């Protein structure tokens, strides 16, 4: 069910990150050398999840693996125990909660009309549902983390914190961000561009779907303008 996927991606997955933040507070702040393997492991896990996204043919699986990759960044930021790292981790959890929930919502919008989640069978939707294509573009751009979204603020904080803590981590971070941009654009092009394979009549997007997407995208834009609400 789509509601379960949205709640799982937006809330339950983030509770794990919140639990790690609470647990890290009772541990002693140690030297860089001790935590470096765990940070590298978290970032390597994020890269592997991103690469898994690139080879997915199922839309829902792709979005689920993208959540896993973003949580890798969150874990890496929490482990270093710096104020910027914690602020970035909290912001990214909130931002990705909105983004992944919006992506699951859009995937369901597509599924209700095509009855399939296979990427190659859902192409050409820009001809059928142009407004939905706009939402797809906006949400994928948020997933890539472009300004002025919350995702950009959070990834900037995490990147700065990790680079100051250990400059070598920028290699893994940069690779992760590059692959994130690749699979996000791949997802958008696969579902929206190209010739449509649908022959049956498709109903237009409803007002409730536009309202749902507005309520996901608006906080992402607004909170980045006033970040003290969450930091």
From Swiss-Prot:
Transmembrane domains' residue ranges: 1-21, 34-54, 61-80, 85-107, 128-148, 169-189
Annotated membrane topology: Multi-pass membrane protein
Pfam family, one: Proton_antipo_M
Single GO term (MF): ubiquinone binding
Chemical reaction(s) catalysed: a ubiquinone + NADH + 5 H(+)(in) = a ubiquinol + NAD(+) + 4 H(+)(out)
Alphabetized UniProt keyword annotations: Electron transport, Membrane, Mitochondrion, NAD, Respiratory chain, Translocase, Transmembrane, Transmembrane helix, Transport, Ubiquinone
Subcellular location: Mitochondrion membrane
Leader peptide range in chain numbering: none
Domain of life: Eukaryota
Annotated Gene Ontology cellular component terms: mitochondrial membrane
A single GO BP: ATP synthesis coupled electron transport
EC number(s) recorded for this UniProt protein: 7.1.1.2
Function text: Core subunit of the mitochondrial membrane respiratory chain NADH dehydrogenase (Complex I) that is believed to belong to the minimal assembly required for catalysis. Complex I functions in the transfer of electrons from NADH to the respiratory chain. The immediate electron acceptor for the enzyme is believed to be ubiquinone.
Family stated for the protein in its record: Belongs to the complex I subunit 4 family.
Protein name, as recorded: NADH-ubiquinone oxidoreductase chain 4
Record gene name: MT-ND4
């Amino acid at each position: 069910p789509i509601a379960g996927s949205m709640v799982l991606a937006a809330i339950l997955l983030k509770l794990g990150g919140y639990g790690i933040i609470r647990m890290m507070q009772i541990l002693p702040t140690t030297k860089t050398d001790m935590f470096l393997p765990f940070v590298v492991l978290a970032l390597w896990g994020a890269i592997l999840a991103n690469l898994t996204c690139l080879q997915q043919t199922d839309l829902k699986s792709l979005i689920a693996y993208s959540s896993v990759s973003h949580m890798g960044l969150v874990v890496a930021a929490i482990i270093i125990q710096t104020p910027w790292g914690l602020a970035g981790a909290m912001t990214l959890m909130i931002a990705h909660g909105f983004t992944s929930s919006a992506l699951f919502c859009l995937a369901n919008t597509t599924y209700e009309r095509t009855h399939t989640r296979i990427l190659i069978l859902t192409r050409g939707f820009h001809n059928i549902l142009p407004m939905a294509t706009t939402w797809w573009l906006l949400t994928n751009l948020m997933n890539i983390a472009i300004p002025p979204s919350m995702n950009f603020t959070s990834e900037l904080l995490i990147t700065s914190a990790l680079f100051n803590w250990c400059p070598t981590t920028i290699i893994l971070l940069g690779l992760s961000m590059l692959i994130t941009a690749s699979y996000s654009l791949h997802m958008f092009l696969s579902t929206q561009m190209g010739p449509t394979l649908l022959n049956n009549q498709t109903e237009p997007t409803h007002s409730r779907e536009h309202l749902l997407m507005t309520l996901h995208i608006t906080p992402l834009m607004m909170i980045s303008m006033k970040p003290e609400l969450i930091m």
